[in-house]
Design a protein with these regions (language model features):
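General beta-strand structural signal in soluble alpha/beta enzymes
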Residues: 99, 119-123, 153-154, 203-205, ...
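Long hydrophobic segments that form regular secondary structure
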Residues: 254-255, 259-299, 303, 371
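Positively charged, low-complexity intrinsically disordered leader regions
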Residues: 14-149
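A short, small-residue-rich loop immediately preceding and capping a beta-strand
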Residues: 136, 144-183, 276-289, 310
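A glycine-rich, Thr/Ser-enriched phosphate-binding loop motif common to dinucleotide/cofactor-binding enzymes
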Residues: 128-139, 250-265
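Glycine/charged-rich beta-loop-alpha catalytic/anionic-binding loops adjacent to active sites
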Residues: 116-127, 146-152, 244-251, 273-278, ...
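Active-site-proximal loop->helix
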Residues: 161-224, 320-333
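Active-site/ligand-binding loops adjacent to catalytic centers
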Residues: 84-86, 216-254, 274, 299-302, ...
Length: 380
């Protein structure tokens, strides 16, 4: 009788455990379940985006053009239409420092909202730098180190991208120079200190280190700066240093590519609880975060197996997708970048900080990619 009672008790515990597993707060993966490839949505797009143009001749940019700034690995990925691009073993091994990231059920938020909907969020804040930015910083710096580069140059707004690059540069033993928008530079000393701890040199932008910065300071000595100005300074600085390469946190195809580990993990995690979302919502600035979670889900819509609504939430201070004009424009104030086809409020538009659209996201917005219908919600 005691043995029977014990077995019944164990069976009862087992049933409770099964029930708990079916409705968890967090859905976790093992390191072996980290994606082995990045997903390139260009491989599934029937209509390709308009080409990025060289401003000197208004012709499509070439590999040679980008090779002046970026590592060879990133240049290859920028022009690739291959659907799946293998993640290098060394990069995937470094991803294991914090990946896979949890998919969390927001049960208390559901209760407060009084909704029957299941709300999940992907917690990318567990990365060493505190954001999704590290997903691209590590491969970009990896490819630069592979090319024999000794120094990495970049820009940052609030400091998340700069922190991610500083962390990656420290892993590969490279020097790191960060141009940080002056407003956040003064307002967020903790981010600045974090970059310093990882060995980066941080310069407030606009600065006296570049012609773009000097011009801005001459016009307004008290300028708080903008991300567009910081990009210009970083590109100018990198262009004159033969031993360095520039890395960027949004804009380019290869950045969006690297971020797709987010959505791929989500798909695997939902499979663990036999769920699949009908709506994907993500904040949208330069497009990397939105693309990271949305693009892998768009694959199933493009092949006709699923129907999903994609919602982008953009800042009301820079409503580029909802109020911007679709045209070719620079991605920075100083006109150092190529010309991108995108929804833009103008490269010289000056909110705090400066924003511009991501070309591939913009192409989705004009409905050439029917999975993205352009539901746009303004954040504060």
């Amino acid at each position: 009788l005691q043995q029977l009672t014990k077995r019944q008790s164990m069976n009862s515990i087992g049933k409770e455990q099964v029930k708990t597993k079916a409705d968890p707060y967090k859905i976790l993966l093992t390191e072996d379940e980290i994606p082995t490839h990045w997903y390139n949505i260009l491989g599934d797009m029937k209509t390709q985006p308009q080409p990025t143009l060289d401003p000197e001749n208004n012709q499509p940019v070439t590999r040679e053009y980008y090779s002046k700034l970026y590592s060879q690995g990133c240049v290859d990925q920028e022009f690739s239409t291959e659907k799946w691009i293998e993640i290098p073993d060394e990069v995937r091994d470094l991803y294991k420092i914090w990946r896979p990231t949890p998919l969390v059920r927001a049960k208390r938020l559901e209760k407060i909202l009084g909704t029957d909907c299941k709300i999940y969020y992907k917690n990318e804040g567990v990365s060493p730098s505190g954001s999704h930015k590290t997903n691209s910083a590590i491969p970009q710096v990896y490819y630069a180190a592979k090319d024999g580069v000794k120094k990495i140059i970049t820009e940052t707004g609030a400091g998340q991208w700069g922190s991610a690059v500083a962390f990656a540069a420290q892993l590969f033993g490279l020097k790191c120079e960060v141009f940080m928008v002056r407003g956040p530079y003064n307002q967020k000393p903790s981010r600045r200190r974090l970059m310093h701890l990882w060995g980066a040199h941080v310069t407030p932008s606009p600065s006296d280190q570049t012609s773009v910065g000097r011009k801005q300071l001459a016009e307004n000595p008290d300028s708080r700066g903008s991300l567009g100005t910081a990009i210009s300074e970083a590109i100018e600085y990198a262009s004159r240093d033969a031993g360095s390469k520039y890395v960027i946190g949004s804009i380019q195809n290869f950045v969006l590519l690297h971020q797709t580990v987010i959505g791929q993990e989500c798909i695997t995690q939902f499979g663990k609880v036999d769920e699949f979302p009908d709506t994907i919502i993500a904040p949208l600035g330069g497009g990397a975060n939105f693309a990271g979670i949305a693009f892998p889900f768009m694959e199933s819509v493009l092949n006709g197996s699923k129907k999903i609504k994609f919602i982008a939430s953009e800042p009301a201070t820079c409503p580029k997708l909802s109020e911007g004009e679709f045209r070719y424009d620079y991605g920075d104030v100083g006109k150092k970048t190529p010309l991108f086809p995108m929804y833009t409020l103008g490269h010289d538009f000056m909110p705090v900080p400066n924003h511009s659209g991501r070309p591939k996201i913009s192409w989705c917005r004009i409905d050439h990619l029917s999975t993205y219908k352009g539901w746009l919600y303004h954040g504060t």
